Amino acid sequence: KAYPDKKILLTRDKDVYPTLEDRVNMANSVKLKKNESILYVSVHVNASLSSKAAGFEVWYLPPEYRREVVDKKTVPKEIHSILNSMMEEEFTMESILMAQNILDGLDAQIGKKSPNRGIRANQWFVVRNVKMPSVLIELGFISNKTEIKLLNSPDYLKKCSLGIYNGLSAFISNFENN
């Protein structure tokens, strides 16, 4: 409601499990108008062999990983690699900034109950395969008894949602003002 001009597409809104590939395809199939932007935010819970692992973190694609984000059919082949490299660098910077804003939002909401594990880079399937700025959020560990209780609490989940929302709002405001 706060962003009536923004489209929000949920890959799921009930207890179903689309494959990671389905989620990526759904995101990549969104048609943008001129001057429209798109972000991909994937929300997960973590697991570990250690029951002591705890905390929230936000992941982005490492800058050294290169993907094709510009469709070869849409630009002359002479400039494709240059344009693709420029877009990929822009997407990487936006992903890092979005990750930090979301992490800050989560830290403000849940940082007293769960450790902040920071922003991190890795080639997770969803951030590697979407053609847009993207992050993967891990809200806590289902292998940790304390965090299971938190993640089953509606109040805690509302705080997680508010933290993500506040982080995205800060990112969007900064992005639109610059």
For the regions a language model picked out, list residue spans one by one:
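Active-site-proximal helix/loop segments of hydrolytic enzymes
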Residues: 1-178
